[in-house]
Every structure is written in structure tokens, then in C-alpha cells.
Amino acid sequence: MNAARMNIKVSTPSRNYFVRIGKGLLQEGGSLARQLKLEKKIALLFDQAVETYATTLIDSLKAHDFEPQALAIPSGEGSKSFKTLETIVTALAEMKLDRKSTIIAVGGGVLGDVAGFAASIFLRGISYVLVPTTLLSMVDSSIGGKTGINLPQGKNLVGSFYQPLEVWIDPEVLATLSPRLISAGMAEIIKYGMISDQKLLDEIEKKEQSDLLYLIKRSVEIKAEVVGEDEREQTGRRAILNFGHTLGHALEAANGYKDLLHGEAVAIGMHASCLLSNRLLSFPDESTQRLKKILQLYSLPLKARGLSKKDVLEALQLDKKRERGTISWILLQKIGLPITSKDITKEDIDWILKEVLA
């Protein structure tokens, strides 16, 4: 296997599958589908913003005698809704798909989440392949089988654990991604460095000189390892992937899923978690400063602007990881050593919101 082609295995109790990484994979979609022995009729869902890439994949599938039927989904977090879910499953029924049929979803995390959820419930479950087109979805949401939609009250409150058949990552699609979206994706890569891998942080700090293919590969490896150990968040191991997400999700909900990108919210959440870790666990000041410098290096925010404390607190109370009225926070004892804490007091939360709400 040469450096341009990497296959990372994800092993879970419900399914083992490969994440395939390589430049030009979109043009090889037909061949990859043939290797998977997919049925001829394929539902190809794509984000309207990446129609060009969807067309490339459709052409490849047709060249290998598949019959892709395309459905465009509007871009944006608003598509993680019951309305979009209904649109998708209705279209699947009209396409006359059966239980051996497959969905291929081309787009970012929003499309992957709602397409995966549709796959999990249509005919009580059909297979799906994810083709992530944003950096964030490549390194995070496409791996691990979390699917779902949002409610007005909070993010990902309706969904399922349902693993894909495969994930195809073609880094060439990132060439058309805006710098802001690249930075948003980098937030999740930074997360992996903070919870697991100092060497990954070293590479991240090189910025323009960093090896993007390596950053993607290493992030996928870390997530695959964690998901393999705790697919359905039963043991607590998978919870470490929520570093920065407890507050991050609350900020997104309080913002109405509008101006703040997921990666930006996670960046603020990681900053907050480091400050709390310093306050409660003596997490080193220099490590907090290191995170701040990395976030600033990628133009990621440290504070949320224009949000009310009341709205953020209400959103925190709807956190889906809440148990018996208690919210779990992922804190760090040191870089690479995360812990789950349920001992965050109201005073701690009041303090941290003063620190990160501008």
C-alpha cells in the first residue's frame, strides 16, 4: 500500500469496515462499489454545495454499470431535521429501493448524519457509504456510526448508532473548501491531539508545513481505536471524544445553529475545558497557553460573542449526555490524559461562562 492510499479498519461489535483515504478516490467510486458488491440501483444523496464532486462519482458509478439515482439536499445545519429526513425516506421509497440497496452520501457532517439516520430506519436498515467532503466530517462525524438530527431544543437529540459500510475520503475535495471551514475541521484534529497524541499536536503546530494527509490519517486512527473500544458509549471510553463538545453543543444551540460553525464552537469548548481543568485538576498553565496559541494559529475563537448566559445554561440542561440531572464534562489532567468529571458545580459553570462569553 503506497502513501497515497491508506485503508484504516474500524472494528466494532456491530460491523467492521474500512475508511479508505486517497487522492482521486471519487473517480474510483465505481470500482470501489464493485468491490463491495453493491446492488445496481444506488441512492446517491449529495449536499447541493458539492454537486461537482457528486457528478464525478455518479459518472464513475455509471461507467461500472451502476444506476445511481441522485437527490440533492440543501446545505447547512438546518437540514438535520425531521423535514429533511422525511424528504429522504420518501425519495428512497419512490426509488423502490430494497433491503439490499445502498445509500451513498456525498457531503459534510450534516448530510452524513441525516443520511445515516435515514439508512438506519428505512426498511429497518439498509447499508450506506459515506463520502465526506469537509475536513471536519473526514476526521470526525464520518467515523463511528453516530447518526441523527437536531431538535430546536438541542443538537443530535434524535438519532441512532448505525455504522456505515465504508467511508471514502478523497483529500482533493478540500481544495475548494474555504479557509474558515478548513479551520473548523482543524478544531477536531486539535481535539485528538489534546486527548491522545502529543506528536499530532507537534505536527498541527507546523501549520502550512504540516502534512494534511497525515493529520487526517492519524485522526481517523485515534477515533477508530476509541470507537472500537466503546461503540455505544457504554464504558465511558468513547466519552473522551466529547472533549470541548459539552459546552460547544450548548453554544451552537444557544446560537440557533446559525453563525457559529461546529468546529468553532468546539474550539471555544476546548478552551473552556482547559480553563476548568486548570481550576479543578491543576492542568498546567503552559498547556492551556499551548492550546490557545494553536487555536489562534488557525483563526479559531476562544470566546463566543453575542450569546446570553441564560440561553447557554438552558442548552446545557438539554445535553444528551446528561444522566440523573448531572452533566459530564471531559477535562484533562495533562495533554493526552482525559478524564470524565461529573463534579462541575453551578459555581464552576458560572465562572467558566464569564470567561468564555464575550
From Swiss-Prot:
Its EC number is 4.2.3.4. NAD(+) binds at residues 75-80, 109-113, 133-134, 146, 155. The lineage of its organism: Bacteria, Pseudomonadati, Verrucomicrobiota, Methylacidiphilae, Methylacidiphilales. It comes from Methylacidiphilum infernorum (isolate V4). One of its GO terms (molecular function) is metal ion binding. Zn(2+) binds at residues 188, 245, 262. Pfam families: DHQ_synthase, DHQS_C. It catalyses: 7-phospho-2-dehydro-3-deoxy-D-arabino-heptonate = 3-dehydroquinate + phosphate. Signal peptide: none annotated. GO terms for cellular component: cytoplasm. This is 3-dehydroquinate synthase. Belongs to the sugar phosphate cyclases superfamily. Dehydroquinate synthase family. Keywords: Amino-acid biosynthesis, Aromatic amino acid biosynthesis, Cobalt, Cytoplasm, Lyase, Metal-binding, NAD, Nucleotide-binding, Zinc. Its cofactor is Co(2+); Zn(2+); NAD(+).
